[in-house]
């Protein structure tokens, strides 16, 4: 718990500073896309994660890899922010900073993140219907769906928005029926 507080003390100010820079330069969406791309890279490449986290790797090598990963189209301000993290030895917090920045961008644009778990893969129409339903329930401008599958649900979906969970799965219905039957005895 103490470690999370210490990480938050580093992550939040840097993410806030990046958001301020993004707003001042009217590049919030571009920076958010850059952060999402980096988060995706952290998920897909253990090699990249290890490289960035390794304190023995020289700063110039890290800058070169970051520049190569971001490509020619990345905004100069964003790239300079990454270089600042390298110079201040805060690059190990990059993943957390990107996660916090994306959360700030969602809040700024009134976008809700919904974790959707279904028994089977959802069709595009089903995803759109869930997004519309979540939008109605939350009053958000838009909804981002984080979709996963879990065959143990048997059927239906479980939707988590913030701390609220909406269980419309067959497994959840069976559990509620079981609790009702056990409770009536």
Curated annotation (Swiss-Prot):
GO terms assigned for molecular function: proton-transporting ATP synthase activity, rotational mechanism
Entry keywords, A to Z: ATP synthesis, CF(1), Hydrogen ion transport, Ion transport, Membrane, Thylakoid, Transport
Subcellular location, principal: membrane
Intracellular or extracellular location(s): Cellular thylakoid membrane
GO cellular component: plasma membrane-derived thylakoid membrane; proton-transporting ATP synthase complex
Subunit structure: F-type ATPases have 2 components, F(1) - the catalytic core - and F(0) - the membrane proton channel. F(1) has five subunits: alpha(3), beta(3), gamma(1), delta(1), epsilon(1). CF(0) has four main subunits: a(1), b(1), b'(1) and c(10-14). The alpha and beta chains form an alternating ring which encloses part of the gamma chain. F(1) is attached to F(0) by a central stalk formed by the gamma and epsilon chains, while a peripheral stalk is formed by the delta, b and b' chains.
NCBIfam families, alphabetized: ATP_synt_delta
Family: Belongs to the ATPase delta chain family.
Name of the protein in question: ATP synthase subunit delta
């Amino acid at each position: 718990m103490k470690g999370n507080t210490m990480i938050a003390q580093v992550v939040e100010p840097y993410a806030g500073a990046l958001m301020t820079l993004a707003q001042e330069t009217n590049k919030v969406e571009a920076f958010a896309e850059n952060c999402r791309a980096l988060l995706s890279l952290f998920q897909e490449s253990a090699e990249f994660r290890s490289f960035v986290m390794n304190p023995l790797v020289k700063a110039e090598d890290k800058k070169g890899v970051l520049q190569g990963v971001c490509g020619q189209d990345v905004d100069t301000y964003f790239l300079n922010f990454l270089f600042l993290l390298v110079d201040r030895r805060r690059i190990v917090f990059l993943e957390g900073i990107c996660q916090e920045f994306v959360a700030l961008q969602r809040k700024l644009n009134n976008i809700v993140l919904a974790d959707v778990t279904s028994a089977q893969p959802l069709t595009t129409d089903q995803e759109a219907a869930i997004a519309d339903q979540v939008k109605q329930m939350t009053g958000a401008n838009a909804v981002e769906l984080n979709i996963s599958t879990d065959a143990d649900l048997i059927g239906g979906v479980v939707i988590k928005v913030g701390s609220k969970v909406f269980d419309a799965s067959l497994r959840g219905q069976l559990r509620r029926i079981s609790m009702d039957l056990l409770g009536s005895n």
